């Protein structure tokens, strides 16, 4: 989030570029506003921003030319990297290995392989994950079901953030018109 000096600097940069910056809005508001302008219908949005290391959930009401943020909730220590670590942890457990015995390089490569596995599962029913640890090659088969099982704690944390946003916004999931 921008602090005041960053907002002033952004407006000044816009002026230098010949653009009149009337207002600076946050990313969830911008996403909801962009979707709203596609339909021009009053809509209640749930903006689910799941980054590499953070989760932000916003409940945004768009009507006429107004955008109202009803609730914001988040977890600054929850993101896609947590799934990579869960996949890597499951891989190590399956092969009866412990992270503390891996070199930094081996663990970094394992995390990279876990991320590739996660990405592959977004379009494939299953994928193989291979890693060389201590000079030995290990391989595992991953499915979405396996990742769901190994990351159940992450899903529970995500649900808590979502429930908190809905409660703070005093809305039910059924009232949400669109998820961004």
Task: Briefly describe each language-model feature range.
Residues 1-180:
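Oxyanion-binding/catalytic loops of NTP- or PPi-dependent enzymes
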């Amino acid at each position: 989030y921008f602090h005041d000096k960053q907002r002033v600097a952004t407006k000044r940069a816009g002026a230098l570029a010949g653009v009149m910056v009337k207002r600076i809005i946050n990313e969830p508001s911008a996403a909801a506003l962009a979707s709203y302008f596609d339909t021009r219908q009053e809509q209640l949005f749930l903006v689910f921003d799941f980054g590499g290391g953070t989760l932000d959930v916003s409940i945004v009401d768009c009507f006429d030319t107004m955008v109202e943020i009803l609730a914001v909730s988040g977890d600054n220590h929850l993101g896609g990297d947590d799934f990579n670590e869960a996949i890597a942890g499951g891989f190590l457990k399956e092969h009866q290995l412990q992270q503390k015995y891996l070199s930094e390089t081996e663990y970094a490569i394992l995390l990279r392989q876990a991320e590739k596995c996660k990405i592959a599962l977004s379009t494939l029913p299953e994928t193989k994950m291979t890693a060389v640890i201590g000079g030995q090659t290990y391989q595992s088969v991953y499915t979405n079901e396996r990742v769901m099982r190994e990351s159940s704690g992450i899903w529970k944390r995500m649900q808590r953030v979502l429930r908190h946003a809905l409660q703070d916004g005093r809305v039910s999931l059924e009232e949400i018109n669109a998820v961004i």
